[in-house]
Design a protein with these regions (language model features):
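Beta-rich carbohydrate-recognition and catalytic domains
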Residues: 1-153, 158-189
Length: 189
């Protein structure tokens, strides 16, 4: 099934647009199991529900011209949860566990002074269809000397050292920086 609907004024048909709303922050991922590309994105409904917005949706493609919608993969949390609103993330496949891991930014709704405005969270899937959030994992910047409110957009890769690296955009002492977290198992950083 193709869900492609071009909005290109020159009718080139070069990009995907969902039937409802807009694509925000595409997160491309080559799926080594399926042999195709998955493009996860923040689904922007406009207007979005108050406080909870940007669930992660996805499409798959083999040629970047025809797309199959995979629908919603990772839902927003409740207003009380750290991921009431979801921000950009990154996906990686772990050959050892045969699991997909998507790390994303959890944006707290109306954070108090004691809350973290942003934190890194993750969900896993064995089939790229059904995702389970790891509710016990919340990586907080202030636990490592970084900002508790500017801690976002994780990017994951497996380094030449054989370890997983997660780069996080953040601030430290009022200056922008990229934090590099390292893990052997994608669970302990």
């Amino acid at each position: 099934t193709s869900y492609f609907s071009s909005t290109d004024e020159t009718a080139q048909g070069t990009y995907y647009k969902p039937a409802v709303g807009y694509v925000g922050d595409p997160m491309p991922f080559y799926d080594p199991v399926a042999g195709d590309f998955k493009i996860m994105y923040l689904q922007d409904f406009r207007p979005n529900p108050a406080g909870t917005y940007h669930p992660i949706w996805a499409v798959s493609t083999k040629d970047a011209a025809n797309y199959e919608s995979l629908g919603e993969l990772i839902s927003c949390g409740t207003l009380q949860e750290q991921d009431a609103a979801i921000g950009t993330g990154s996906t990686i496949y772990d050959e050892n566990s045969k699991l997909y891991y998507t790390f994303y930014t959890g944006n707290k709704y109306n954070p108090t002074a004691s809350d973290n405005g942003q934190a890194i969270m993750y969900a896993t899937s064995s089939d790229f269809k059904t995702w389970t959030k790891c509710k016990s994992f919340i990586l907080k910047g202030d636990d490592y000397g970084y900002s508790k409110n500017d801690f976002r957009d994780p990017f994951l890769f497996k380094g030449d050292d054989g370890k997983y690296h997660m780069l996080v955009a953040t601030t430290k002492n009022g200056k922008g920086t990229i934090a590099d977290f390292i893990s052997d198992d994608l669970k302990s950083w």
